[in-house]
């Protein structure tokens, strides 16, 4: 793919118009444009790139994707099959926020008793208006971790998403739920054929850029469920929908956060999902991910254990069929003494589906007495199915258990 095509995907005017439509502060515009500048300079990954091994990205023509505009229509409640199923299993909820790009509507509900206690569960766009200074620090601060063309694309073009903040010493037993329902048909744009004065309709795939920021303050406890799904549509045949998502978790000292993430999409969806968690002193993150369907899922789950007593437990379940492809990359980065991580992935594949799991345990020189474990087991239920496992260790300390 040519650089010119990649550049056409994000024009500077597109980023500036997004800021103008949303009425965003100058600092956010500067941050978006910085992401756009870096995006143009960053090479496109290929199937030979280490973190993208076996993922088919070479044929993804970014110039044929159009970013979906922010959802403006608010409604009281949205009924979706995936959401209804989740509610049946979860029971009562602390709050629900749904972005339905298929209908161009969104729905937000939260227990008022929680907001009275200082809990923030709000669309990211709304939160920017009410908590601009706090979000500025979270969004603009440069942090360690993976950064490539897709993370920079999300930085420049994220349209909405969720901000969840739990005050210190607050325990919330009921779960919060955030769901994104992807567009189901290609977008038509009027273009002029070369040498003709008439316009013709050209179909483009669509791109969605959700962003989640979760902050758990000292000694708080919260349960969070995030789902991304889509419905099949004949109108979408042959047109890829790109979902480029980012989830950022901040756990202060003593915080306890449980996250369940479900991805269940149609065969025309390519999901790139980046999860990054910063885990403080004596804080615990339980993260469960379920990859249940898509054309391709490329997910990176990065846990950075920043202080003694930090614990990260990551569990993954992948169920593949047809010609679906799943690529999961976990990174447990131990940067302090006395930290613990436990990563377990289970994969079952039918038909011609494929998966690759890459697990990296990093132990910095200072991170003595690290206790870390990772396991990936695969069940192949079809003669054409294939699963690869690539565990890695990068250990600089000498008193560890891995």
What are these regions (language model features)?
Residues 2-152, 344-350:
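N-terminal amphipathic, basic helical "cap/leader" segment at the start of enzyme domains
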Residues 109, 115-402:
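Conserved beta-strand/loop scaffold segments within soluble protein domains that form the structured core
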């Amino acid at each position: 793919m040519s650089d010119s095509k990649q550049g056409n995907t994000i024009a500077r005017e597109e980023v500036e118009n997004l800021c103008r439509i949303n009425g965003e502060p100058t600092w956010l515009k500067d941050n978006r444009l910085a992401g756009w500048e870096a995006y143009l300079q960053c090479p496109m990954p290929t199937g030979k790139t280490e973190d993208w091994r076996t993922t088919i990205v070479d044929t993804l023509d970014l110039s044929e994707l159009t970013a979906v505009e922010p959802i403006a229509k608010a409604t009281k409640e949205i009924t979706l099959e995936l959401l209804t199923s989740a509610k049946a299993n979860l029971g009562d909820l602390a709050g629900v926020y749904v972005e339905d790009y298929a209908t161009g509507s969104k729905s937000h509900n939260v227990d008022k008793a929680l907001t009275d206690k200082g809990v923030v569960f709000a669309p990211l766009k709304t939160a920017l208006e009410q908590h601009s200074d706090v979000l500025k620090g979270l969004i603009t601060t440069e942090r360690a971790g993976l950064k490539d063309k897709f993370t920079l694309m999300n930085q420049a073009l994220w349209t909405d998403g969720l901000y969840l903040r739990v005050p210190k010493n607050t325990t919330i037993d009921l779960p919060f739920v955030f769901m994104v329902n992807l567009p189901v048909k290609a977008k038509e744009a009027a273009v002029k054929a070369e040498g003709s004065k008439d316009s013709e309709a050209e179909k483009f795939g669509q791109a969605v850029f959700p962003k989640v920021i979760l902050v758990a303050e000292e000694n708080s406890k919260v349960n969070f469920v995030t789902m991304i799904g889509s419905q099949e549509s004949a109108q979408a045949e042959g047109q890829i929908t790109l979902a480029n998502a980012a989830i950022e978790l901040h756990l202060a000292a003593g915080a306890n956060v449980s996250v369940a993430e479900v991805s269940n999409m149609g065969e025309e969806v390519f999901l790139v999902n980046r999860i990054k968690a910063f885990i403080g002193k004596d804080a615990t993150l339980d993260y469960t991910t379920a990859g249940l369907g898509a054309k391709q899922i490329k997910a990176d789950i990065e846990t950075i254990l920043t202080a003694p007593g930090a614990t990260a437990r990551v569990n993954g379940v992948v169920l593949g069929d047809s010609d679906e492809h799943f690529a999961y990359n976990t990174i447990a980065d131990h940067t302090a003494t006395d930290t613990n991580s436990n990563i377990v992935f289970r994969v079952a594949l039918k038909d011609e589906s494929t998966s690759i799991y890459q697990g990296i345990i990093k132990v910095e020189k200072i991170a003595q007495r690290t206790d870390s474990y990772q396991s990936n087991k695969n069940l192949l239920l079809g003669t054409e199915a294939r699963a690869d496992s690539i565990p890695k260790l990068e250990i600089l300390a000498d008193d560890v258990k891995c």
